[in-house]
Amino acid sequence: MGLIEVKDIRVFAYHGCLEEEARIGGHYRIDITVSGDLVRAENSDDLTDTVDYGRITSIVKEQMAIRSKLIEHVARRIHTALKEQWSQPLNWRVRVVKERPPVQGDVAEVTYTVEG
């Protein structure tokens, strides 16, 4: 079993339930973890035998560009797109962090995680 982690993919996006979030936007961080049988890549040293983290980053940015009201929805879309890109049995974990959400009080971030 192997584990690949792509941490702190930083994106500016326009998610949220408030109208001002659609206009002003906000900062997000996304962490992707994928685990599974990566022994072939360990032995071959060939990019086609592994999960290309450059492609992971592209998929995250593509999905983050599609506006959603909820980070739960964004996380599920990213998760689905990743699973569709790589058909082998892998376990994916997607963590979406919304920095400085517009709520009452001083809140640094809100996080949602989906995996499977």
Regions found by a protein language model. Give the residues of each.
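N-terminal, polar/charged subdomain of small-to-medium soluble alpha/beta proteins
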Residues: 1-116
